[in-house]
A protein has these predicted regions:
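Alpha-helical interface subdomain recognition
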Residues: 1-81, 90-91, 103-108, 115-120, ...
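Short Gly/Pro-enriched turn/cap motifs at secondary-structure boundaries
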Residues: 116, 131-134, 158-161, 175-177, ...
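A short, Trp-centered hydrophobic/proline-enriched beta-strand micro-motif
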Residues: 119-127, 436-443
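Flexible, small-/acidic-enriched active-site or ligand-binding loops
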Residues: 138, 191-221, 466
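A structural signal for short hydrophobic beta-strand segments in well-ordered beta-sheet cores
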Residues: 141-144, 453
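A short core secondary-structure module
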Residues: 148-149, 153-198
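A short, charged helix-loop
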Residues: 214-238
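Feature captures hydrophobic
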Residues: 395-518
Length: 518
């Protein structure tokens, strides 16, 4: 069938990946599942075939092929039904090395990118910490400058390839007081004194090793920093878009394989004297799954097309991640049901698919985080800019965006008290003409206090103390409240991390529509 995205060359490439999977993955997959790691030879063979370089520049051994080669490649890897293999390879190729490829120096690229493309080195990326998952900016791992080196202390967890890798790109705070502007990416090599790892046990992705990393006074040369100091958070945010598309592409291949295996079983399995594919309820269930997968496929390909044409499709990639990972769970659940008791047996690949799919709605940004990102874009009209090509512009805008307009309108509030007292000046009067509410703010710490905000048909006032019957009570520390209001902390992350408590989240979301942000 003709495609607006794939050419004959793409299809020939797809066939070569399919043959590779049949020869180099399928015969060894069960062994890797048992050993809980894949063979290093697989990376070497992927490198020899040129697969690990399809997304990287030619100067370092890649081919810089268009993104639809990546689609064909990852879909075929996913059809192996070994999601752990897919995780290990995709993290190495599209996440760990991606930052080095986009922002690293020539020296870093020669030391880490080139051998990664050749399959001679395996990479990992370490962002998640024991005390914070999706909340990137709350990380505690630090990198303190000491002459020509950084001294790194902290820990990371749930790191794919973490116990297996030759190097890891670590997100850490180079300036503990700068918020999101103080996070940097630094490469640490396996074997560096003070760097240790422990392999974690998981319910799925068995062939992909997952590690917990510890850094105890790890000394790393300053040359190992990726890009500019203090730009790590922004690099991570942009690279998340590719990570989310990778999840969607793998979901296409895995979903198609799961449905194909289920149809094959339905052809063979008989009940009540006929093939179970003849039962209308089962036929309709399968057709519905195929329809939903086709919708997800087109959504994913459209987002990939946007990337290919120079866009950073935050909205579309977040939709892909949200939709495809939820759909993957639905597909494996429905398909396992078709297999009946056999689907619950480890001898059938559907059992492994069921275990493996579950983590999809957690890694790379949870379903809940995807929905909040989309809420900001669709409801709050938030816009995102490219980072790698405009690092200084992005960093400065994170600090001072709209500062002039703010000062002209309602001053320049900095403390929690000043911010709360400025709320009546920030009301969108026309939009809030029919809006009435009572909010209480219980703010602890210096510059905190207790306040009641009363809004009556677009007119707002703040009174000291907790008065009346509130629709919502906001409880937090003054520093946290200031960081949220001044753009130094993501409110969703603060809420999920328990740093701010809101008694009525629906009322708070409604409230936010009627007031200008600082």
């Amino acid at each position: 069938m003709k495609s607006q995205y794939f050419t004959e060359e793409h299809e020939l490439f797809r066939q070569s990946v399919r043959q590779f999977v049949q020869k180099e993955i399928l015969p060894y997959g069960n062994q890797w599942e048992t050993e809980e790691k894949i063979s290093r030879d697989l990376f070497l063979k992927l490198g020899e075939q040129g697969f690990l370089g399809i997304n990287h520049e030619e100067a370092y051994g890649g081919t810089k092929s268009d993104i639809f080669y990546t689609c064909a490649y990852l879909e075929e890897l996913a059809k192996s039904s070994y999601a752990g293999v897919c995780a290990a390879v995709s993290v190495h190729q599209y996440m760990a090395t991606n930052h080095i490829a986009e922002a690293g120096t020539h020296e870093l690229k020669e030391r880490f990118l080139r051998p990664s493309i050749e399959g001679k080195k395996v990479g990992a990326i370490a962002i998640t910490e024991p005390f914070g998952g999706s909340d990137v900016q709350s990380m505690r791992t630090t990198a303190v400058r000491d002459g020509d080196h950084y001294i790194i202390n902290g820990s990371k967890t749930f790191i794919t390839n973490g116990h297996f890798c030759d190097f890891v790109v670590v997100a850490c705070k180079t300036d503990a007081n700068a918020g999101i502007n103080g996070i940097s990416l630094i490469v640490i090599e396996r074997g560096t004194p003070g760097f240790s790892s422990t392999q974690l046990k998981k319910i799925g992705w068995h062939s992909s090793d997952t590690g917990e990393l510890a850094f105890d006074n790890v000394k790393v040369p300053v040359e190992n920093i990726v890009g500019k100091e203090g730009m790590g958070f922004f690099y991570i945010m942009e690279s998340f878009q590719i990570e989310r598309l990778v999840a969607g592409i793998l979901g296409i291949g895995g979903g198609e394989q799961c449905l194909e295996e289920t149809l094959k079983y339905m052809n063979e399995r008989e009940a009540f004297g006929r093939q179970i594919k003849k039962f209308q309820v089962l036929r309709h269930e399968m057709v519905q799954l195929y329809t939903e997968l086709e919708a997800g496929k087109q959504m994913t390909y459209n987002a990939c097309w946007l990337v290919q044409n120079g866009e950073i499709p935050v909205k579309e990639s977040s939709m892909v991640k949200l939709y495809m990972t939820e759909l993957s769970n639905k597909i494996v659940d429905k398909c396992l049901q078709m297999f009946g008791g056999y689907g619950y047996m480890e001898d059938f690949p559907i059992a492994r698919a069921y275990r493996d799919a579950r983590v999809g709605t957690i890694v790379g940004g949870t379903t809940q985080i995807m929905r909040e990102i989309l809420s900001k874009i669709i409801i709050d009209d938030v816009r995102y800019k490219k980072v790698y090509s405009n690092p200084e512009e992005i960093k400065s805008s994170a600090v001072s965006e709209n500062k002039t307009a703010v000062e002209k309108t309602w001053g320049n509030p900095q403390t929690a008290k000043e911010i709360i007292l400025s709320i009546p000046l920030r009301i969108k009067k026309e939009k809030a003409s029919d809006y009435s509410t009572v909010f209480q703010f219980d703010i602890s710490g210096d510059n905190g206090g207790q306040y009641t905000l009363i809004v009556n048909n677009g007119n707002a006032k703040v009174e000291e103390g907790l008065q009346g019957t509130p629709e919502c009570v906001v409880t937090t520390d003054a520093k946290v409240y200031e960081d949220i209001e001044l753009g130094r902390m993501d409110p969703t992350m603060a809420f999920m991390g328990g740093q701010i408590r809101v008694t009525n989240i629906g009322a708070m979301m409604q409230f936010a529509k009627f007031f200008h942000r600082i």
